[in-house]
Amino acid sequence: MSDNAKHHRDGHLVASGLQDRAARTPQHEGFLGPDRPWHLSFSLLLAGSFVLFSWWAFDYAGSGANKVILVLATVVGMFMAFNVGGNDVANSFGTSVGAGTLTMKQALLVAAIFEVSGAVIAGGDVTETIRSGIVDLSGVSVDPRDFMNIMLSALSAAALWLLFANRMGYPVSTTHSIIGGIVGAAIALGMVSGQGGAALRMVQWDQIGQIVVSWVLSPVLGGLVSYLLYGVIKRHILLYNEQAERRLTEIKKERIAHRERHKAAFDRLTEIQQIAYTGALARDAVAANRKDFDPDELESDYYRELHEIDAKTSSVDAFRALQNWVPLVAAAGSMIIVAMLLFKGFKHMHLGLTTMNNYFIIAMVGAAVWMATFIFAKTLRGESLSRSTFLMFSWMQVFTASGFAFSHGSNDIANAIGPFAAILDVLRTGAIEGNAAVPAAAMVTFGVALCAGLWFIGRRVIATVGHNLTTMHPASGFAAELSAAGVVMGATVLGLPVSSTHILIGAVLGVGIVNRSTNWGLMKPIVLAWVITLPSAAILASVGLVALRAIF
């Protein structure tokens, strides 16, 4: 095995065993498989959520609301959330499951807590409709019924495209999917209503141009940051640990050989010589345990050579990287995640924090994480170095994935809940408003659908991100997730057009480039899927809109 092939294994035997288990995760397990109770539980939970929410929505929308459209919108909206869970959420947790840090069930639990919490706590109680966003509907005459048809068509088209991508294992942008659906439905409405010229003018083509730019900008930024970050981690932590462990293994073999050699030499001595040598060994054992021990006092060759071996062991500061570098990396990572939460995840909560307040919070969290990680590293002394490395990066990866999940829940669930909330608002008020209220009941229901989607159809995307694009371990998975979070945060502040999905895939590729183990062949269909996501959703939505206008 070459040095490069060896060096990228940051988890060694422990990580490899867990990786093999992750790689064997089945792509699909039927209802008769070992996870049958989980399948049944999520099926019942999904059905129960739909029934309870529909019952609540009938009362919320009022007696004058069209019940057929309300039920249809609920089904389509939950179906969209289901597919967002199978793609976006699976994409977010793919590195954690692929690295063996989390099992599928553990990832589901973390996603359920943090995704739903992010949606309910920080998702915002009001969402903007697309009236003047990617499509400006003010240029055409749109009545409430046609507006709902646009939203229904967009949700249906985006969900169907995501379902296809999930079945193929392609991580694609759910945001681009819903945007494509809205654009296609809006243009189709303009065409069928005889407003052809206005139909094309109402699309904000500069926004579409930014999406095209994001196809290149997002993976490049994610890959560049990940390449640099993981390069530092590998050079200063993983390679150092591997060299230290290799040296300790050599010293251990030397110690065993030393013992065997002296045992054989002792057996060759006469009985009188053995008695004398035993006395010398006993005196050396006492001397070696004194605080003021002087190596020159040793009488026996056994203890003199043993002292030299012990000196070699002491010269190998095996845990230096874990105590010096890992706390710094963990502190920097925690600061990035907290910054992403404060500036992106909590942006809908209007906490009233000043910029200086945010900076102090970020600094305090960074200091606390540095101290906690440093103490944790000290407690691991005496443990296997490879296992200690695996444990520390596993904790850091779970922390990063949890923060990413919360931020995702607070923002990207809007791809499903936004159009649905707009439909619900029109059914309740009979008018098209610039903003639509998002009831907490809808957030919880769609959160359940999100988690169910991760469980039922998320395995293929997890396999793609977790180990099909490149071999993933806790350190490399942490680097990919943290790089993606950092780029998303920076792009949000700078206003750059990026996609979090594309960024994370780029970050995974960056790790693979460092390890020279990137599956470029798999990237070809994934990039093609990115390019055709928007037009595919647009075509499906245009067909859906024509069908809905014919039915209703």
Curated annotation (Swiss-Prot):
Coiled coil: none annotated. It is found in: Cell membrane. Keywords: Cell membrane, Membrane, Phosphate transport, Transmembrane, Transmembrane helix, Transport. GO terms for biological process: phosphate ion transmembrane transport. One of its GO terms (molecular function) is phosphate transmembrane transporter activity. The chain crosses the membrane at residues 38-58, 69-89, 107-127, 146-166, 178-198, 213-233, 326-346, 360-380, 389-409, 437-457, 472-492, 493-513, 526-546. Its main location: membrane. The keyword Flavoprotein does not apply. InterPro entries: Phos_transporter. It is a multi-pass membrane protein. GO terms for cellular component: plasma membrane. Potential transporter for phosphate. Belongs to the inorganic phosphate transporter (PiT) (TC 2.A.20) family. Was identified as a high-confidence drug target. This is Putative phosphate permease Rv2281. It comes from Mycobacterium tuberculosis (strain ATCC 25618 / H37Rv).
